């Protein structure tokens, strides 16, 4: 039976007898992903006109797996930060951007909360 991937954090679930000689590195990566999800922090510089898409890669560290995301950069238009819609996760998002424009945190197929142009606060998403 081959390895599978967990639904929420995209951890590698190793099948019995798989990954001879490499299971330790896979386990270490899984532990680092758990650390990211529980207490991880990343500052994400937004593109001035389009925002950013948070990555959420199977079996790997990814900025979208962090608990706390600080949005930075100077924005020159209303922008979106796209989070994955295939997972259920709570984020703490700090809007530390400059520029008199909005930032909406949403999934690619949905809607989400918007930071107003003057709203430089923290939101739970």
Task: Show the residue positions of the predicted features.
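Short, aromatic/His-centered strand-loop micro-motif at the edge of beta-sheets
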Residues: 110-116
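Extracellular disulfide-bonded cysteine-rich modules/repeats
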Residues: 24-26, 118-125
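Exposed extracellular interaction/assembly regions and N-terminal maturation sites
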Residues: 2-102
């Amino acid at each position: 039976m081959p390895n599978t991937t967990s639904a929420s954090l995209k951890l590698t679930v190793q099948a019995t007898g798989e990954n001879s000689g490499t299971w330790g590195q896979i386990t270490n990566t899984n532990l680092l992903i758990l650390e990211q999800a529980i207490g991880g922090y990343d500052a994400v510089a937004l593109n001035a006109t389009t925002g950013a898409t948070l990555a959420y890669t199977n079996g790997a560290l990814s900025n979208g797996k962090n608990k706390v995301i600080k949005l930075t950069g100077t924005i020159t238009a209303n922008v979106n930060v796209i989070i994955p819609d295939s997972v259920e996760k709570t984020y703490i998002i700090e809007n530390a951007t400059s520029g008199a424009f909005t930032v909406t945190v949403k999934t690619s197929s949905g809607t989400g909360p918007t930071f107003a142009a003057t709203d430089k606060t923290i939101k739970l998403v």
